[in-house]
């Protein structure tokens, strides 16, 4: 049983698969419909907007009193998460000389993979010690931290 299912079971809810479906559909739709916003508004601005939406979604998942709220939270989280990786990737690659862009993109991808490798056990420990609901609170805090770092990087880039 995955964390999504255990979260639903811990709340006494049914239909956990719908939550993942809503997340996935919103993620894909946002990528398809708004990918051009990165070139239009810039990577930092797009990432800041998306992380803000993602954070709201995670907080809704944390506080959800019913499956309806959880579905809305999952949708917002999927929508928000969709453009963070490509938007920040655009900004990361801007910092690398043209001759090294392939290596720069590889390094960016490695750090994303490293973050995923750390997040799994970390969130597992949160679930084990605090309960499944607190995974979403912890993820929201990390999203706020990422938002703060992105704002800082945007200010530095504009200076």
Located regions from the model:
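Intracellular juxtamembrane helix-capping segments at the cytosolic ends
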Residues: 83-96
């Amino acid at each position: 049983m995955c964390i999504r299912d255990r979260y639903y079971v811990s709340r006494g809810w049914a239909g956990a698969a719908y939550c993942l479906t809503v997340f996935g559909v919103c993620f894909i739709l946002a990528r398809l419909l708004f990918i051009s916003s990165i070139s239009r508004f810039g990577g930092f601005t797009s990432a800041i907007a998306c992380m803000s939406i993602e954070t709201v979604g995670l907080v809704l998942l944390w506080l959800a009193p019913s499956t309806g709220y959880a579905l809305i939270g999952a949708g917002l989280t999927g929508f928000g998460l969709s453009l963070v990786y490509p938007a920040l990737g655009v900004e990361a690659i801007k910092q690398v000389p043209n001759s090294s862009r392939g290596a720069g993109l590889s390094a960016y991808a490695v750090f994303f993979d490293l973050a995923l490798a750390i997040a799994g056990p970390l969130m597992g420990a949160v679930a084990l010690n605090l309960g499944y609901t607190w995974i979403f609170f912890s993820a929201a805090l990390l999203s706020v931290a990422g938002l703060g770092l992105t704002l800082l990087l945007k200010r530095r880039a504009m200076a």
